[in-house]
Amino acid sequence: MKTNYILALSGNDIFSGGGLHADLTTYTVHKLHGFVAVTCLTAMTEKGFEVFPTDSTIFAHQLTSLKNVPFSAIKIGLLPNVEIAEQALEVIQAHQDIPVVLDPV
C-alpha cells in the first residue's frame, strides 16, 4: 500500500536551516506527511557549533513507536555516531521495498 508517509532520521538544526525542520517543510510543500526520529540536537556554544547525539535507547524508542507506520520512503540525515548509524541501518533493512535517500551532512 503506497502512502504519503515519509520517515526522516534527522538531527535538529538550531538555526532551522536544515535537519528535521527542513525535512518537514519540504514534505509539507509536496503534500507529504512527515515523521521524524531525532538523531541529535545541535547548539552554538563557546566551543562553536556542537552536535549532541540522541541517546541510543531513546532513539530506539522513537523507532519502535513508528514501526507499524506504512512509510513510502525514508530520508537519512545526520547520523552522529556509530550506534545511531547502526539503528538507521536496521530501519533500512526492515524497509527494503521502499526508496531511501541518504543526505550526508
Language-model-derived ranges and their functions:
Residues 49-105:
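Glycine-rich phosphate/dinucleotide-binding loop and adjoining beta-alpha-beta core of small-molecule
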Residues 1-73:
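Small-residue (G/A/S/T)-rich helix-start motifs and N-terminal tracts that mark the onset
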